[in-house]
């Protein structure tokens, strides 16, 4: 294992923290500050907690109410414009002229390619089986990426309604999905 004395850093944000960790590890190796680095990240979007006002940590909640905020909505919101990242996807599609059909086609191709790679066992040596405890039954073994849907069709995608703007182009089928997962790499000079 990795000795306890090994220096570490943690990046705590909703998305791309794993990629940032890999970039930092690469910089450490490139500058000679490290010969070997372990980098990675996790996403646990299905278990994001509800949040209370930050001041409650230090001041408590004395004789008053506090509003619970959905941590997932907070994480998927733009802190500058205060709207969901799905609206950002709509804005980007509009700005760069990406049609609904193009988005659906990319989603379809992505699902098909991923499903084919899974069925051919291309990820078998990259995914570690995880046992997920159940309340009243044996643990479920997760050993495959659950995001790709092999039954995705262009017809099915085209029938989905926009979810972020009334006349928008981003749907539950062509938007980024909400996932749980983790990845780790060992990097060396």
Feature locations, PLM:
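Conserved catalytic cysteine-centered active-site region
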Residues: 1-37, 79-84, 151-177
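Active-site-proximal alpha-helical scaffold in enzymes
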Residues: 13-43, 93-122, 184-189
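Flexible glycine/proline-enriched surface loops and loop-helix/loop-strand junctions
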Residues: 72-74, 94, 167-172
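Proline- and acidic/polar-enriched loop/turn elements at helix boundaries
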Residues: 9, 41, 49, 105, ...
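A short, structure-level motif marking secondary-structure boundaries and short turns
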Residues: 10-11, 73-75, 99
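N-terminal extracellular/periplasmic Venus flytrap/periplasmic-binding protein-like
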Residues: 102-189
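Short, well-ordered secondary-structure micro-motifs
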Residues: 21, 49-50, 140-144
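Flexible glycine-/small-residue-enriched beta->alpha junction loops
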Residues: 36-92
């Amino acid at each position: 294992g990795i000795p306890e004395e090994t220096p570490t850093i943690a990046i705590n944000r909703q998305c791309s923290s794993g990629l940032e960790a890999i970039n930092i590890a690469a910089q450490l190796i490139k500058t000679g500050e490290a010969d070997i680095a372990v980098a990675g990240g996790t996403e646990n979007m299905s278990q994001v907690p509800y949040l209370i006002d930050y001041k409650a940590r230090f001041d408590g909640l004395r004789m008053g109410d506090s509003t619970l905020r959905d941590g997932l909505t907070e994480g998927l919101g733009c802190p500058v414009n205060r709207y969901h990242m799905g609206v950002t996807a709509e804005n980007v599609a509009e700005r760069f002229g990406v049609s609904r059909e193009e988005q659906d086609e990319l989603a379809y191709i992505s699902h098909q390619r991923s499903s084919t790679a899974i069925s051919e066992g291309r990820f078998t040596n990259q995914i570690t089986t995880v046992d997920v405890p159940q309340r009243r039954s044996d643990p479920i073994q997760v050993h495959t990426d659950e995001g790709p849907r092999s039954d995705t069709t262009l017809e099915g995608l085209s029938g989905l309604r926009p979810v972020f703007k009334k006349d928008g182009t981003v749907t539950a089928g062509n938007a980024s999905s909400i996932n749980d997962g983790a990845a780790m790499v060992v990097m060396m000079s």
